[in-house]
Amino acid sequence: MRYRFGVAVAMLGLAAPAYADAWDFILINNSGKEITLIELSPSGANQWQKNKVDEGEKPKNFKVGGRNTVHFDKAASQCKWEIKATFADTTSTVFPAVNLCDASFVTIRFNGTTPVSTAS
């Protein structure tokens, strides 16, 4: 009887979904443009999620040179993310392959027209 119970418990563990963890980082906006929306997607997945804000709060714009906290749900094994910034002029740019597992701060900027991100 104990054996069957143990097997049943083990099987439930296998059927459990992979839960996402709530993560955050500080985004430093050195893009030269005000940002109105930040979205994140696992690299190459094209599954965008908006920066999460607390219930009852309005999303805040990311001023040029400013620092804002970005909140998102991260799967346990996913480290490389794409960050999409939508600017006040309604254009958007994707900053690719940012390692968010090892970063507390991410700076985004442009080198000419090429999007560049630095994580630390």
List the model feature ranges, each with a label.
Residues 78-88:
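A short, solvent-exposed beta-strand micro-motif common in secreted/extracellular proteins
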Residues 26-32:
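Asparagine-centered strand-capping/turn motif at beta-strand->loop junctions
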Residues 33-37:
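Short acidic/proline- and small/hydrophobic-mixed sequence motifs that coincide with surface turns
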Residues 47-76:
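Intrinsically disordered, low-complexity Pro/Gly/Ser/Thr-rich segments with frequent PxxP/GP/PP motifs
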Residues 1-7:
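Bacterial N-terminal signal peptides that target proteins for export
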Residues 7-8, 18:
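Cleavable N-terminal signal peptides
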Residues 92-120:
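Extracellular beta-sheet/turn segments enriched in Thr/Pro/Gly and aliphatic residues
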Residues 14-20:
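Sec/Tat signal peptide C-region and signal peptidase I cleavage site
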